[in-house]
Design a protein with these regions (language model features):
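Elongated, amphipathic alpha-helical interaction scaffolds
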Residues: 1-141
Length: 141
């Protein structure tokens, strides 16, 4: 059952996307607060972009998809307790990368990408407000 408009909050998908897409300065401030650094300018790439690679494969729908300072950002509202956010983030990253680079382009053209989940719960149960995951290079022996 859907909520009436006046009952929607920032965490409802419709309102989350509506507020962040119609208020670019607020969206930029939210990114800066989460990332802990200034962003000069943002540019929306699309609203609730769906990326489907095959007709029978699992696609993704990006809530707030934007670019700023030569980086790409996807901001997702996560209201349910079902997580597996690390694998979901990895999947989103791959799908976004497939969508960002043209056939024959050099891999150096891939932009740095941030997948941000705004959660109503603590997905990793370590009592933290922000969790940061980065791909890192491990040395070989």
């Amino acid at each position: 059952m859907s909520k009436k408009y006046e009952d929607l909050t920032f965490t409802d998908d419709f309102m989350f996307c509506k507020i962040l897409y119609t208020n670019p300065e607020l969206c930029k401030q939210l990114l800066e607060l989460i990332l802990g650094r200034k962003i000069k300018k943002i540019r929306y790439l699309t609203t609730q972009n769906t990326i489907d690679i095959t007709s029978d494969g699992k696609g993704i729908r990006l809530d707030v998809y934007l670019e700023g300072d030569s980086k790409v950002y996807d901001i997702e509202m996560q209201t349910t307790g079902k997580s597996n956010l690390s694998k979901r983030s990895r999947y989103y990253q791959g799908m976004i990368d497939l969508n960002l680079i043209e056939k024959g382009a050099d891999y150096s053209e891939l932009k740095e990408t941030f997948i941000i989940f705004v959660c109503l719960h603590d997905p990793f149960k370590h009592n933290e407000c922000v969790y940061t995951f980065e791909k890192d290079r491990k040395s070989t022996r």
